[in-house]
Amino acid sequence: MALTVSSDSINPGERVADAHAFGVPDGNGKAAPEGGNRSPHLSWSGHPEGTESFAIVVFDPDVPADASDVNQDGKTIPADADRVDFAHWLVVDIPADVTEVAEGAGSQEIVIGGKPVGETSFGGVSGANTFTDFLEGDEDMEGTYGHYDGPFPPFNDERLHHYHFRIYALDTPSLGLSGAFKLDDVNAAIEGHVLDHGEIVGEYTLHADRL
């Protein structure tokens, strides 16, 4: 039996609701950090025997590798531009008896400067999402962004972005990660420990022609 992920908040293959987004359309063809930014409900079942812990990895694989034209007036990021993964939520060491996370457990709202990394309300430890890196140097927004922060793709990006809400079943109770660990750290730590994984995928864009 494969690990199956479901959600009361995310409809697979459909647009992620503004309630779970960081950025939303501003009505003038651009975007603003005014979404609800609530982490979605997630539940999972069918994990294999021998599962010692779970990890949540929420990521967008459609983020432009070159950020120089991101959200720039008069510039367009073509759909075929090179892309990289952008983490929106990283939680490891979730106890094996936890198979559901309530809506809002990873974020209730936008916190300028980020939420602290560390222990979660449902068990496990949260690292730093990629807004930590993306907003570095922005005097108004920079900080360490722990726990969940939702979609905020460039308003001038022609590509539809896909948000993978992935659960890993692992054969170890702890990956040994702490502090502001990032997506690369999780990917390296789970190597050789993944028993199974499942996911649901939502979509989001802020490009005016796709709204």
Per-region residue spans from a language model:
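N-terminus-centered regions that define maturation/targeting leaders and the start
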Residues: 1-211
